[in-house]
C-alpha cells in the first residue's frame, strides 16, 4: 500500500490518499514491464511496408539482348534484382508485429509500473473543475503550483476529462491526457511526472485492483 499527498488546484495540501495494488516480484518486475512495453510498441506498428519481387514488377518479359556475342554478361530480364528498377530480393511484405502476452501478465505489468512511479505521483482535487473556457496557460500555471518542473514530460490521468480540459492540454507538446481506465505501461514509464485526479485514483483502484 502506498500513500499520496492530495493537493488542491492551488497546490496546497488537502489530505491523503492511498493506493493498494498487487505488484510483481522484484526479480521479475523489470522483465515483465519490458515485455509489456515491447508488446505495446509492436502493436503500434502498421506492418504495411511492401516491395515487389522480380515476378511482380511490371515489364521485363523480353530478353534485353541476345545470349551470346555481345561480350557482356548474359541477361534474361530488365527486371532482375541486379538492375535499377528491378525487383527486390527478400524485401518487406505486409505482416503483423503483434506479440502475445496474457491478460494476467498485462495487468500485473501495469500495476507494477504504476506503483514503481508512486513517488512521482501528484494527486489533485477536482483537476480543472474551475476552468470555464479552454486556456493552456491555466494548465501550465497549475502544473507549476503542483511542483512539476518546467519542460518535464507529464502524464495527466483523469476519470472523465472534460472537453475544456482536453482543449487546454492538447497544445502542450510534453503533456499527455488519458482516462483512468486507459492506463498503459509505456506512458507510465515514459513520463517524468504523473498527475492524477482524486477520482481517478479511486477508478484505478476499482479497475486494476481486483486481481
Curated annotation (Swiss-Prot):
Listed Basic residues bias regions: 60-71
Q: Write out the GO cellular component annotations.
A: ribonucleoprotein complex; ribosome
Does the keyword Ribonucleoprotein belong to this entry? yes
Report the GO molecular function annotations.
rRNA binding; structural constituent of ribosome
GO biological process terms held by the UniProt record = translation
- Disordered: region residues: 41-86
Q: Which UniProt keywords apply?
A: Ribonucleoprotein, Ribosomal protein, RNA-binding, rRNA-binding
Instruction: Tell me how this protein assembles.
Output: Part of the 50S ribosomal subunit.
Entry's family note: Belongs to the universal ribosomal protein uL4 family.
General function of this protein: One of the primary rRNA binding proteins, this protein initially binds near the 5'-end of the 23S rRNA. It is important during the early stages of 50S assembly. It makes multiple contacts with different domains of the 23S rRNA in the assembled 50S subunit and ribosome. Forms part of the polypeptide exit tunnel.
Q: What protein does this entry describe?
A: Large ribosomal subunit protein uL4
**Which organism's genome codes for this protein?**
Synechococcus sp. (strain CC9605)
Amino acid at each position: 500500500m502506498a500513500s499520496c499527498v492530495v493537493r488542491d488546484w492551488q497546490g496546497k495540501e488537502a489530505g491523503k490518499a492511498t493506493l493498494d495494488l498487487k505488484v510483481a516480484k522484484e526479480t521479475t518486475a523489470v522483465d515483465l514491464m519490458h515485455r509489456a512495453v515491447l508488446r505495446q510498441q509492436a502493436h503500434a506498428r502498421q506492418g504495411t511496408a511492401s516491395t515487389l519481387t522480380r515476378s511482380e514488377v511490371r515489364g521485363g518479359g523480353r530478353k534485353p539482348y541476345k545470349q551470346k556475342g555481345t561480350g557482356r554478361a548474359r541477361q534474361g530480364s530488365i527486371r532482375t534484382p541486379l538492375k535499377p528498377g528491378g525487383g527486390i530480393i527478400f524485401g518487406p511484405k505486409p505482416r503483423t508485429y503483434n506479440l502475445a502476452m496474457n491478460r494476467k501478465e498485462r495487468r500485473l505489468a501495469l500495476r507494477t509500473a504504476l506503483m514503481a512511479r508512486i513517488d512521482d505521483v501528484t494527486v489533485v482535487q477536482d483537476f480543472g473543475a474551475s476552468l470555464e473556457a479552454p486556456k493552456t496557460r491555466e494548465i501550465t500555471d497549475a502544473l507549476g503550483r503542483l511542483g512539476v518542473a518546467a519542460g518535464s514530460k507529464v502524464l495527466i490521468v483523469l476519470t472523465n476529462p472534460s472537453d475544456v480540459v482536453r482543449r487546454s492540454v492538447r497544445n502542450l507538446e510534453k503533456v499527455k491526457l488519458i482516462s483512468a481506465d486507459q492506463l498503459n505501461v509505456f506512458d507510465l514509464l515514459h513520463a517524468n511526472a504523473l498527475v492524477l485526479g482524486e477520482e481517478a485514483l479511486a477508478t484505478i483502484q476499482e479497475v486494476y485492483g481486483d486481481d
